[in-house]
Amino acid sequence: MSLSLDDVKRVANLARIEISEDEARKALIQLSGIFGLIEQMQAVDVSAITPMSHAQDVMQRLRADGATEIDQRELFQSVAPQVEAGLYLVPKVIE
């Protein structure tokens, strides 16, 4: 993908970034290098490689899924300014 100096300036403008001519040239060189690396990676034939979710085929040991805290709903609602049917009542902010 070819990138021009005008493209860099336009993206900087869209991002609301003030960029000088010298900074735009430096950014163009850096972005062109990044796009070059991406093009190299896209050129690699990976059709014969099986997709994997992790580098090592191991199972992760997980802890038992259980409640670790006690229910404090009543305590929290006792200090709330307004509660009705277990719900917190708040002032209407949007008409």
Curated annotation (Swiss-Prot):
It catalyses: L-glutamyl-tRNA(Gln) + L-glutamine + ATP + H2O = L-glutaminyl-tRNA(Gln) + L-glutamate + ADP + phosphate + H(+); L-aspartyl-tRNA(Asn) + L-glutamine + ATP + H2O = L-asparaginyl-tRNA(Asn) + L-glutamate + ADP + phosphate + 2 H(+). Its EC number is 6.3.5.-. One of its GO terms (molecular function) is ATP binding. Pfam families: GatC. InterPro entries: Asp/Glu-ADT_sf_sub_c, GatC. Keywords: ATP-binding, Ligase, Nucleotide-binding, Protein biosynthesis. Belongs to the GatC family. Heterotrimer of A, B and C subunits. This is Aspartyl/glutamyl-tRNA(Asn/Gln) amidotransferase subunit C.
